[in-house]
Structures are given as C-alpha cells and as structure tokens.
Amino acid sequence: MSESFSFTGGAVLTPDGVFETADVHIADGRIVDAPSRDGPRIDCRGRVVLPAIVDVHGDAFELEIHPRPGVDLPLDIAMGAVDRQLVTNGIATAFHGLTISWEPGARGIEAGRTFMDALPALRPSLTADHRVQLRWETFTHDAIHDIAGWLRLDPTPAIAFNDHTTLGLADLRSGNARKLDRWAQRAGVSLDDYVACLEAAGEQSGDVAGRIGEVAAMAARHDAVMLSHDEQTASERRASREIGMRVCEFPLAREVAAEAVAAGEHVVMGAPNVIRGGSHTGAMSAEDAVRDGLCTVLASDYHYPSLLHAAERLVARGVGPLAATWTLVSANPAASMGLDDRGAIEPCRRADIIVLDCSGPWRLVHTVAGGVLTTLGRRLSS
C-alpha cells in the first residue's frame, strides 16, 4: 500500500515530545492534514505511533553482500534482503557505512566503487531510503578522486574520517596477530599479504593530515555531513571540529563525548552496546552515556534489530521515558544528518512512521517508509 491511508486512534508522539490520541493521514509519501476520501483507515487504538527510525551508521549490509570471505552475492539480491531487514526493524532511513580502505576485498576501493555505482539504480526498487556514510580510512589516498565524485551525488553521502591503520600498526608492533589475522580473513588474503598492505599504507603517514584537510574541504563545499570516529581525547574532538566534523561518532572516552555535547554536537554510539550491557571493545557504556546526557544518537552499528531493542531496554530500565528515548533513534539522528523532512510526525514531513504495541514485550505492527506501508505484527524477539 503506497497511496493514501490513515492511522486512527493511536497514541501519537508529537513534535513537542508528548503523546496525544490522534489520527495520522498519509498521501503521496507525505504526512497530510486531512484524510483522503477513499483511503483505508487503520485502527491503532491501544498502540503507539512514532516517527520511524533513522540509522546513521550500519554496516550489517556487508554480510549480505559478502557472507563469507571471497564470496560475493549479486547486489540486487543482497540489498533486497537488507531492505527487508530494515523495514521489519522499523528503520525507514539507513546510512550504510561503506568502508573505503587500502584493504583488499570487501572494504577495498574497488568494492566501494561497485557499490556506489550500483546503488542509484537499486534505490527505486527498495522500500527504505538507502543512503551512504563513506567510512574513509584516512591512509587511503588513492580513493580521494573517487570521493570527490561521490560527493557530487544526490543524495550527498555523509563522510566519516576513520583511522584503523594506526591501530593496526600498533597491533603489529605489539605482536597482536589475532586481530590482524581476523582482518586478513575479512579481506580474503593471507596474514603476510595483509601485513604487507598495512605497512605500505603506513608509509603514507606523513601525508595524512594534509589529505584529511583536503577531503574535509571538499566535503564542506558539498555540504556533506562530516563525522569524526573513535576519538580518544577532547583535544582530538576540538581539532576535528575546526575542520568541519560536527558529529562525534563512537567516542572512546567520556571527555570526548562531554566536549561534543558542550559544543551542541551530536554524539553517536552503538545500539548493540546498549542491549549487550557494554561495548564489545571495552569502550564506554552507551547506556551510561545516555543516562548522563553524553549520547544523543544511537546507531545500529553491526546489528539492525538493536535499535528497537535498545530503545525498549532503556525505557524498561528507567533511563528515560519513551518520548525522550525515542529521540535517540529518530529525531536526533535525522537532525545530525541534516534531514529536516523526517524524524517527526507532522504535516508535510516524509511519511516515515512505525506503529508499536507496547502492552507487553514491544511488537512492531506497521512500518511506513516514504508512504509505503508494510504490516508486520511480529514480536521483536521472534
């Protein structure tokens, strides 16, 4: 169903952050003031009507494209499966974290080119709004020409400035072969070949700062949202801010998040961190950060269902009421990405809406993405 319909009698989260019993009308992909003459009316009494989820960083799509090292599936099949995962988890807008790295294989430049070339043609067949966050590994200078072209696309991708190379070199020096071996398996090469690529990338360290400035200037010219990544100190956050990185993604220390929040910037942390009770890498707790006002956005990271489950867990544990908690997965992510046409339920906004039954364990009943209605009616734990 993608034309005109109404949700009636539900508890609707208003832009003011309160719930009101109201009807919500959808036509031609937008929220409108009045119902259409012939559109169906869907009874939502006893249910909660919320703006759909906006995911600013998710890389679970990689496993659909590359389910095993060296195994690639057709992009149309893989992204169709990703689309269904998004919709069945209440996500109407997804920024796919596309790593652009010196690594061979799934995260290499050529794989990035293939994805970016294919996505525009796939979009019309997909229900959710599929966008891209370019996860540029800052030692990958061969990709800068490609990035310049991608920044001209519509919609403009976001860009995150990642440095896992320095970490990899540190692991190499310390003899931590386990992590490097895992990365080599992901790239589909031997450990020796991976180390050779890593060391070759490391030889460009003297040029990295200048290249970061170059790419940041390009991104600014195209009004692309820029994100920092894995910052460890407040001084790093300030330096990132100076060149235009206004979103702080996955800070590794409280002082970084506090610096960002004090400057009015959004801080992104992983929803899996919430549902697991902590970070899988030993970084700061997302639940504690939310409780302390140091996290404003949750992202799926590597697991799409975590966004709904994290919101449910935070409400159940008394971290915040539903209205306030929901801003972490809808209004704030939309704002952080500069998407002022979604993240709230009001006329003229894009019709991205979910309907939840919260009478017991949360049950997602309907997802609307760009006016397209999907009826689900399943429990989140199923």
Positions of predicted regions on the chain:
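C-terminal cap of metal-dependent C-N hydrolases
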Residues: 10, 28, 329-331, 335, ...
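Metal-coordinating catalytic core of metallo-dependent amide/deamination hydrolases
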Residues: 101-231
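Hydrophobic faces of well-ordered beta-strands that scaffold small-molecule active sites
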Residues: 52-56, 94-96, 130-134, 157-163, ...
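Glycine-enriched alpha-helix->loop->beta-strand junction motifs that scaffold or abut catalytic
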Residues: 153-157, 240-247, 262-268, 293-296
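N-terminal metal-binding scaffold of metallo-dependent hydrolase/deaminase domains
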Residues: 1-38
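Metal-associated gating/positioning segment near the N- to mid-region
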Residues: 44-115
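Divalent metal-coordination and catalytic microenvironments
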Residues: 10, 24, 29, 46, ...
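His/Asp/Glu-enriched, well-ordered alpha-helical/loop segment
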Residues: 263-273, 277-358
